[in-house]
């Protein structure tokens, strides 16, 4: 009797479970048609059954009512699982996963692996794109902040791309790039006003020293020193110019791009024409291309471009600002023009007189750029027509004119700093030197007297003229027409220094 009751007691749960299966099957036709159906153990098992079991044709689909709930539950849960580990191990560890049929387990694992693979691929692509953008932005920002590096690299590419260039040119280019970078980074760490003054004075003086070294008979050591001085001077000038401008990154990048275009145009044209010049002329050619930025130190063509009204309007429209500069751009700082000698450059910048527009018009700047570029355009034309005999004569003379102009600019700014308190002495000296300079120019044009004395006097005259023109140009009490007169004086000095008596020595 006891054994019989025990058998009945054990049979009751099985009957109850079977009845529950029948009731569940009657409520869900999909479960009724699935022979591999097992008792419910977890919500995950129900989800996989609803998701991967195909509906029976002709019968209502039980998934239509609860599929959205299952999707929401699964999306939340699997998102949490993927955030924690992102692997299929958690899928295998879900309650009731092992109780699922093999077909459902395999398909679910494959689906999860495919999802994880797509997610990892998209994540790696996003990381690669983000890393590339960060590197590109850092590189562009670095070039924008130190855009003189573009010019130095352009020089090296131009030197290394020609087979005719001597080996010392390539070696010196790499060596001088490192020297120029170190010097410029040191300058960037110091005060901006001091950097600007040092760059304006040191770059032309270094180029003048390079020209003096050219008079020494060429040897390996002298050639390296020449290239080092030239590239260091260019780097110093550009570092000071970039720090002084205080422009937005887009403007700095535009300035660097303009210089890159100009320099690569000159260098690539020389390579394409493939002129077989002598070593002395090659050195002069290197110096000529290295001095182009320094001769036009006060009149940067890229700065002229971004100072035009059209460019400023486009930048303001792009950024939605009223001023394209990060802060108000400083005018040329001349101590002699200060009323209060103890005022700094920042305090002088806040002067109410500065509210006047001190920028020249874009048309006048374009004319000045064209006038400055005339002698270099002549060199380009000579390269294009392949007149080697003329190039042998023109390049050294124009190189000498560039050195003279660089020395004149340097001396002019030095006079501005030293004679700030005695402007009348400067004006009187300019008048005296004007008479002497016109006499020297007349002698040079008549080929009566072309000696080193003429070079010295012409350089001093150019320096005085530049100093006087800059004084007029920067005086806020003068009208705009008078300021343009100062601009004209500076341009005239540069033209006389660059292509004065040198053009008279060309032999056709």
From Swiss-Prot:
Q: Where are the bilayer-spanning segments? A: 133-153, 168-188, 197-217, 218-238, 253-273, 286-306, 365-385, 398-418, 425-445, 446-466, 486-506
User: Which key words tag this protein in UniProt?
Assistant: Host membrane, Membrane, Transmembrane, Transmembrane helix
Q: Where is this protein chiefly located?
A: host cell
Q: Kindly indicate whether the keyword Metal-binding belongs to this entry.
A: no
The protein's location, in the record's own words, is:
Host membrane
Give the top-rank taxon of the lineage listed in the UniProt record for this protein.
Viruses
Indicate how the chain sits in the lipid bilayer.
Answer: Multi-pass membrane protein
Can you supply one Gene Ontology CC term for this chain's record? membrane
In which family does this protein belong, per the annotation?
A: Belongs to the alphaherpesvirinae HHV-1 UL43 family.
Full protein name: Membrane protein UL43
Species whose genome carries this gene: Psittacid herpesvirus 1 (isolate Amazon parrot/-/97-0001/1997)
Gene responsible for this protein: UL43
